[in-house]
């Protein structure tokens, strides 16, 4: 296992809830909002932030930490134009760098290939969305094997999904429904059925 590299930092301020379009009654509840990330919107911008370090086996590794104030979770939208299949991509949080989601560059390329085979040639088809980290920070790490130059990487993170609802807690309505359901099942232990 490799030690997590020191991550460059990208910080977004608090999400203005006034700009969030809330869900209409009777429709699925909106729990997150797409946010533009100017600091990493292009491959050139992202490339300037990578702080490449040599790995023990002779490859290179770098990481970037994205922080969105007030978020209960983050998903990074990684726009892939060129990614070596031999690369390893990891997602974790700075608070728990040992809890890692890891995927090969090849697996990401196959997901994108399926999107394009279905007829979608847009940037959306070339975007891989990371899993939700469950907190307001997400670290994207890329490891390149020996012999693969950093210039072989052409990715950007133009957007992230800012989860603004705490999905581990019930909404007020869900809580009230739980309370009502509990009342139905309440009984006094001294009231026994004599049948």
Regions found by a protein language model. Name each.
Residues 1-195:
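Domain-level representation of secreted and single-pass membrane ectodomains enriched
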């Amino acid at each position: 296992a490799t030690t997590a590299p020191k991550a460059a930092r990208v910080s977004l301020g608090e999400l203005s809830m006034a700009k969030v379009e809330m869900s209409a009654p009777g429709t699925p509840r909106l729990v997150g909002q797409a946010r533009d990330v100017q600091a990493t919107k292009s491959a050139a911008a992202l490339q300037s932030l990578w702080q490449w370090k040599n790995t023990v086996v002779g490859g290179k590794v770098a990481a970037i930490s994205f922080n969105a104030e007030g978020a209960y979770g983050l998903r990074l939208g990684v726009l892939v134009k060129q990614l070596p299949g031999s690369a390893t991509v990891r997602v974790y949080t700075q608070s728990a760098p040992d809890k890692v989601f890891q995927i090969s560059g090849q697996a990401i390329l196959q997901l994108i290939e399926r999107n394009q085979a279905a007829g979608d040639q847009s940037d959306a088809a070339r975007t891989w969305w990371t899993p939700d980290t469950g907190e307001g920070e997400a670290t994207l790490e890329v490891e390149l094997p020996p012999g693969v130059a950093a210039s072989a990487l052409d990715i950007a993170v133009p957007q992230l999904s800012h989860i603004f609802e705490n999905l581990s807690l019930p909404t007020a309505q869900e809580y009230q429904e739980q309370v009502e359901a509990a009342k139905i099942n309440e009984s006094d232990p001294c009231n026994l059925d004599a049948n």
